[in-house]
């Protein structure tokens, strides 16, 4: 009897349990989740289905749902638009080129923060590199406008060239794309460095100690321990960069004038959608939105599966190497 009383006396009561351990009615966590759910439904799901409906419809009236008819004519008109083709080219090239540069530069800087600087300075350097992320986007855009100014820009002055980056007057030029690319890589660098450096600091330090005992140099430890350990983080960042790259919106570099961006080679899919909505061409805007969605999904699937394909090829190469070594003995 005494043991039973002692056992039940030591058990925690409901008031002593943590918040996550206490039984809660369904409506309490649902109320916390409800704002995010409503935001997603109102600003993501409903607009997506409206875009789907307008992209395959021949009726240009956004609110007239009674006379809708299925048609692919909108997509035919879309791909015959030269502005859309140029925007598609710029968005795809931006996403393709900015992805490796953003990841590689962020990995190098994060490695320097984690492995070079002392522990007391890690937080300081993380804060320094994260400052651009919290800086006003308008201020950053104005700074880059001065950097790429063709008359007295910093870039042309330093390299003693006269390249017209943002005011070339040609829709087909790649000069504006390079300016947008540099601006985008720098803008995303702060967030990427913070995420990758945090992932590197979470790697088990015992792995490095064991590797040091096995005479593995820091470079080998980086490629054999650090990179495989942060692979989920790299896949996550890759997905974000793909989506962000396809949705590039360089309007701020052209003084918020869509016509200036298009006339000087700074068009993109998202900018094209913005222009069509301003003009009231909801069918073309909906079709372009669907094309952007399909391209983003396909591009993301190809790159994500590429990671697994590379791992599978590495495993097969190691397997063949081991089998070859066994046959020699």
Swiss-Prot record:
It is a multi-pass membrane protein. GO terms for cellular component: plasma membrane. Residues 88-303 form the ABC transmembrane type-1 domain. It comes from the Bacteria. The keyword Cell membrane applies. It is found in: Cell membrane. Its main location: membrane. Keywords: Cell membrane, Membrane, Transmembrane, Transmembrane helix, Transport. It holds the Pfam family BPD_transp_1. The chain crosses the membrane at residues 30-50, 96-116, 128-148, 176-196, 234-254, 283-303. PROSITE patterns: ABC_TM1. GO terms for biological process: transmembrane transport. Belongs to the binding-protein-dependent transport system permease family. MalFG subfamily. Probably part of a binding-protein-dependent transport system. Probably responsible for the translocation of the substrate across the membrane. This is Probable ABC transporter permease protein MG188. It comes from Mycoplasma genitalium (strain ATCC 33530 / DSM 19775 / NCTC 10195 / G37).
């Amino acid at each position: 009897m005494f043991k039973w009383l002692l056992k039940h006396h030591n058990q925690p009561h409901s008031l002593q349990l943590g918040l996550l351990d206490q039984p809660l009615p369904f409506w309490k966590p649902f109320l916390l989740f409800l704002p995010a759910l409503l935001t997603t439904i109102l600003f993501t799901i409903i607009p997506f289905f409206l875009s789907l409906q307008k992209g395959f419809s021949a009726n240009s009236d956004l609110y007239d749902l009674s006379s809708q008819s299925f048609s692919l004519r909108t997509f035919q008109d879309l791909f015959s638009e030269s502005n859309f083709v140029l925007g598609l080219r710029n968005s795809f090239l931006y996403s393709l080129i900015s992805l490796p540069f953003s990841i590689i530069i962020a990995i190098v800087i994060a490695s320097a923060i984690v492995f070079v600087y002392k522990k007391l300075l890690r937080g300081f350097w993380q804060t320094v590199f994260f400052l651009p992320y919290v800086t006003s986007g308008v201020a950053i855009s104005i700074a880059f406008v001065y950097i790429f100014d063709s008359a007295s820009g910093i870039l042309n002055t330093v390299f003693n060239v006269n390249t017209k980056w943002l005011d070339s007057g040609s829709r087909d030029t790649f000069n504006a794309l390079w300016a947008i690319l540099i601006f985008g890589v720098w803008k995303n660098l702060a967030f990427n460095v913070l995420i990758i450096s945090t992932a590197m600091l979470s790697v088990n330090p015992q792995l490095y100690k064991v590797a040091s005992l096995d005479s593995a140099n820091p470079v080998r430890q980086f490629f054999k321990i650090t990179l495989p350990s942060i692979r989920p983080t790299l896949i996550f960042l890759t997905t974000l960069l793909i989506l962000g790259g396809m949705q590039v919106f360089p309007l701020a570099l052209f003084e918020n004038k869509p016509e200036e961006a298009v006339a000087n080679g700074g068009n993109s899919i998202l900018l094209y959608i913005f222009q069509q909505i301003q003009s009231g061409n909801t069918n073309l805007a909906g079709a372009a939105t669907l094309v952007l969605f399909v391209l983003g999904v396909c591009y993301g699937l190809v790159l994500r599966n590429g990671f697994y394909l590379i791992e599978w090829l590495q495993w097969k190469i190691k397997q063949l190497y081991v089998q070859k070594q066994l046959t020699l003995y």
